[in-house]
Every structure is written in C-alpha cells, then in structure tokens.
C-alpha cells in the first residue's frame, strides 16, 4: 500500500519548468567574467558561445536585439564581462545564460565599479533633486576646472568670448586623466570654494574612453562636487558619456561648449530684448501723452464753457435783445400816437370847434408828457435792473472772490481741496490766485480744533 502522504511526483517537463523558474527568480541578473570559446553566429543573427575559466564553463546565448549594441566583434579566447540572466532550456534540460550586454574585460570591470558606486551614492541620496543648487542668473564670474592644455578649455573660452565677452573667467588648472587627477580635481573645487571668486563652476574635460573619463567616476570627486557651496555644471566628454560627476552636479551639460552656453548670457539677445523694451516704452509714453493731451483739451473746453466772461457775454446778448424789443415797442407806440393825433386833427379840421381844439391840444400835451414820463420811467427801471444784474454777476464771480484775497487750492487730479483729510504729507498742491498759479508740497497737516461756545453763567437777580 502507498503511504497516506506520498512525495510529489514531477514530470520531466514540470521539473525543468520548476528549475527554470527557480533560477530566474532567485538568481536574477548577474555579472559574469570569463573567456569566450566556441563562438558562432548563424543566419538568425543570434550569438552562441561558451564562457569558461580554468575550472568550469557555461553555455551562453546573446540574441540579435542585444548583440547589435556591442561595439566590438567577440573573438575566440577574448576575456569579456557580461551582464546576463540565468535560465534553463526546458526541451533539453540544458542550463545556460542569456547575455544582455558585453564589454571587454578591462572596461567591464570599470563598468562594474561604476555601477556599484552609482548604486551606493544613489542610496545615500547624493543624486536627489532637492540637493541641486540653482544656477545664478546672470552669472557674474565663471570658474573653470579642467586641463589648461585640453580642447575643452579652448571650447569653453571660445563660447564665452562669443556670447558674453565681458564675463570674467577664472581657470583652476588640473589634471583630468591619470592617478593624480581625482585628487587635483578635489583640491581645485575646495580652492574655488575657499576663494569665493566666482558664483558658478564648470567641471569637465573632452571626450574619451571609459578609462580616460574615470577620474570623474571617482568617489572623492563625487563627494567634493556634492559638498561644494558654489553651483557646479558638469561637462564631461560627449553627450553619450555619462559619469558619476554628472549625477552629483547641480546641472549636467552634454559638452563643455554647451556648459559655457548655459552659464553665459547671449549679448545679442539681450540687446534685442533691450531694443524691444525701449520700443514698447516709447509707444506707451506716446499713448500716455496723447491721452493726457486729449484730457487736457476736454477740460480746457469745459472750463471755457463755464468762464464768467462767457456768462457775462450771454447776459449782455440777452440785454441787447431786450433793448431792441423795448425800442421797437416805443417806436410802435409813438407811431400809433401819431396816427391817433392825425385822426384827431382831421376830426378837428372837419368840425373846427375852437374850444374842443384847445381841449384836444391840452389833452395831447398831457398825453405826450405822460408818454414821455412813462418812457423815461421804464427806461430808468430797465437801466436799474441791468445795473443790478451786472453788480450781482460781479459779486458772485470767482474772479472777484480771488481779487479780494481769496485762493482756490486743488490736488493733482483737479479736485478742489476742502478738508485736510483729502491730502497727506508729500502731496503736491496747486493754488489759484488772482494773477496766477502756485504749486506747493504738503510738509505738515494740522487740523483746526473745533471750540465749543461757553454758555453764559446765570446772573444772580438783584435784590
């Protein structure tokens, strides 16, 4: 009989699948160094080879989409460093590795060190954006840490002279390649921070191999860049070259020339902006002056419409119309009187009664006298009313008020000043006098205190 709990029974397929999953899950991606042998490339474009050392060997495959990124042709017996995934080929149960990238052994070791240092500094937070310092805008002085004989310095100076010829540049010469280079770069950064001569630093060099650029993958250089109080722009190699210094720096430039463009101002662009600003300012000033002129013209015409002389001229015109009407009325009455007189004379001539003639003549004389008196009275009354109107107009005229020693004070917007709360110290005031204008500045404001009239004390009645 079978026991109650029998052990798990695997099929061959399940066994190979389980082993493959264990290898891929537990091992993950690893770096392997070894010597290439049995290298082959069939028509599919994939690479098949064996990696071996003195004691063991393992089958490898590198598919076409991965090997197209390799920059050299692998050779039999060549030492390489590969990054690969461990797996199992299930149909045959063969253990193998799938290669993702390949480098010659020398560069491969450097790349491995690069990845290890990058992971370490990432874990410490040296690459985080919150530690990045803002570059000065504009920069008043630029420091350059590079080789004094390299092409990078020439490119940087050429760009700075072209874009911003007046920008001061301080060069901190240092080696950028070799065993002494990291220490010299660190000392140059410390010297620049101690002197505080510039407000931005460019640290970099021209292009080269990974080994040539290795000084900028040094941990000491990375920590010196991170500790710098002066913002640093890294400019190492070409755009495809990425170093540890690029991650730590406050800003990465793809090339030294690009770094010079980043920290400098384009004088031609500044000049164009200034000219554009000047044009906008002139247009705004022209518009402002034109609007002020229109406003002044409107106020001038409005003031002219309300001028006392104009009002007096209107009154004189009205008075002249009244005088004409009065003259016409008098002439009309005189004509009617003459006509009545003629009719009366005709009747007298017809009847010729002498007494009635004498009486009629007396009556006519009386009427003429009364008419003349009436006309003189009405003329005198109209003259008196006209004189009173002229006197009243002169009494209420603002010019007459100014002539008596008074003045009218207004603030900048033309509002007549009536109370001290309308102004504050430093305001400009305009005062109209009889013969001109006075502009003044408020130095002090002193309100007049209101006094209350005392009630008379009650008098004691006389005993």
UniProtKB/Swiss-Prot annotation:
Group of enzyme by EC: hydrolase
EC id: 3.1.11.6
Gene Ontology process terms (BP): DNA catabolic process
UniProt key word Nuclease: yes
Keywords in alphabetical order: Cytoplasm, Exonuclease, Hydrolase, Nuclease
Reaction it catalyzes: Exonucleolytic cleavage in either 5'- to 3'- or 3'- to 5'-direction to yield nucleoside 5'-phosphates
CDD domains linked to this entry: ExoVII_LU_OBF
InterPro entries per the UniProt record, alphabetical: Exonuc_VII_L (IPR003753), Exonuc_VII_lsu_C (IPR020579), OB-fold_nuc-bd_dom (IPR025824)
Source species, domain of life: Bacteria
Chief place where the protein resides: cytoplasm
Cellular compartments annotated: Cytoplasm
UniProt GO cellular component terms: cytoplasm; exodeoxyribonuclease VII complex
GO molecular function, one term: exodeoxyribonuclease VII activity
Subunit organization: Heterooligomer composed of large and small subunits.
The family this protein is said to belong to: Belongs to the XseA family.
Protein's job: Bidirectionally degrades single-stranded DNA into large acid-insoluble oligonucleotides, which are then degraded further into small acid-soluble oligonucleotides.
NCBIfam families: xseA
This protein's name: Exodeoxyribonuclease 7 large subunit
Species of origin: Klebsiella pneumoniae (strain 342)
Taxonomic path: Bacteria, Pseudomonadati, Pseudomonadota, Gammaproteobacteria, Enterobacterales
Name of encoding gene: xseA
